[in-house]
């Protein structure tokens, strides 16, 4: 069960994922913070103007932003792209969310289960609002953002179960996508993840092609230094392969 900010309770549900057609190129882009106030590693912060320019490019050039659940009907999209944001920073709500609304763009945000409400992170109420917006899919970045490659089975299960419980309580949806913290995972991590999720994401690689291992989905890192010409390389190719 989850509880909304107004105190009402609801039954959390898991997203059902159908069979995914093979042979489609789907760029998966990896972001973190969005904004001009830099308080940490600068490459993690894409400027507000840079983010808007990228969204504008996608819109003007016929790209369609999708969620991972949309992959089961990928044939409906000519130029699909998935935007992902790691860690659940508060600027995802204050800076990114207004841009998503302005351009009607979908995004997936990976929230750390025990970090909601901590400094520089979104509050539970903000996570709830984003999840209810129709533009944002809230997914798992584990419970503590620990090193999954160093954990045994019991610790891995605890990370995933506590994360899922926290996010289900906040959003009413049980996560179906896992983002490996810092891209660290092992064969054991993947084996356990298959029991809880339909997809799991890396922090490196290039374009994801449907039919690849869904527990090693590659992503392109969009840093603050990325120019618009660089960005074009990240989103091509997109669509049906030959």
Can you annotate each of these PLM segments?
Residues 104-124, 129:
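A short, conserved beta-to-alpha structural element at the edge of catalytic cores
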Residues 2-20:
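Boundary regions of SH3-family modules and the immediately adjacent low-complexity/disordered segments
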Residues 83, 111-116, 145-152:
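Surface-exposed cleft-lining segments at the edges of enzyme active sites
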Residues 14-84, 89-91, 129, 133, ...:
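C-terminal active-site subregion of NodB/CE4 polysaccharide deacetylases
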Residues 33, 137-145:
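Histidine-centered catalytic micro-motifs
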Residues 94-95, 103, 134:
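Acidic/His-rich structured neighborhood in mature extracellular/periplasmic domains
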């Amino acid at each position: 069960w989850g509880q909304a900010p107004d105190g009402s309770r609801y039954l959390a549900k898991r997203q059902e994922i159908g069979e995914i057609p093979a042979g489609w190129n789907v760029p998966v882009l990896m972001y973190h913070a969005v904004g001009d106030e830099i308080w940490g590693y600068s490459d993690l912060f894409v400027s507000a103007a840079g983010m808007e320019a990228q969204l504008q490019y996608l819109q003007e050039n016929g790209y369609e932003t999708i969620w991972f659940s949309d992959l089961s009907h990928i044939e409906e999209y000519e130029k699909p792209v998935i935007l992902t944001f790691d860690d659940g920073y508060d600027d995802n709500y204050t800076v990114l969310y207004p841009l998503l609304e302005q351009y009607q763009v979908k995004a997936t945000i990976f929230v750390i289960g025990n970090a909601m409400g901590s400094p520089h992170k979104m509050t539970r109420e903000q996570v709830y609002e984003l999840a209810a917006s129709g533009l944002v899919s809230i997914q798992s970045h584990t419970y503590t953002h620990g090193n999954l490659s160093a954990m045994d089975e019991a610790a891995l299960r605890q990370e995933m179960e506590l994360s899922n419980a926290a996010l289900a309580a906040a959003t009413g949806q049980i996560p179906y996508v896992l983002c490996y913290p810092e891209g660290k995972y092992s064969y054991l991590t993947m084996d356990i993840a298959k029991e809880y999720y339909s997809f799991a994401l890396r922090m490196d690689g290039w374009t994801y092609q449907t039919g690849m291992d869904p527990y090693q989905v590659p992503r392109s890192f969009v840093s603050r230094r990325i120019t618009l010409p660089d960005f074009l390389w990240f989103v091509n190719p997109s669509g049906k392969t030959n």
